[in-house]
Amino acid sequence: MLKALTPPKTKRGAVLIDPSYEEIKDYEDAAETIVHVNKKWNNGIILLWYPLLNHRSQIIENMLNQIIEGCKKNNQNIEISNLQLLVDEKDAHKEVALKEFLEHSEDKKNPPRLYGSGMLVINSPWMLKDSTEAFINNIEKIIRR
């Protein structure tokens, strides 16, 4: 639907994309949609939220690379910011089979698989990355106490 609604009548604007990410195809669809929308609406700010999941790290990396390469092909001078908030270490969240978890877990708590969140910003506003990274670093320090 986003493809049909872009470009909007006003040239300036922003869109936040938050796919379900329930299926592997959601990652591919998000990348394809963003590159397509950026080609039609090259001055629009496009924000993509994505989860940081250890078991899908390669899929997420592929999605981000596809978006960045596609948007750079549309405009090699485009500003793209990739911001990440880590609430835990990536390796702290390993996948455990249910049987193994039930038999061997001392505390009976399965470690969460989501270790943070990311936001890819296409046509990011000036100084967004610098000001946001300082803020994110402070939040991470508070969370990890």
Predicted regions and their residues:
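Class I S-adenosyl-L-methionine-dependent methyltransferase catalytic core
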Residues: M1-R145
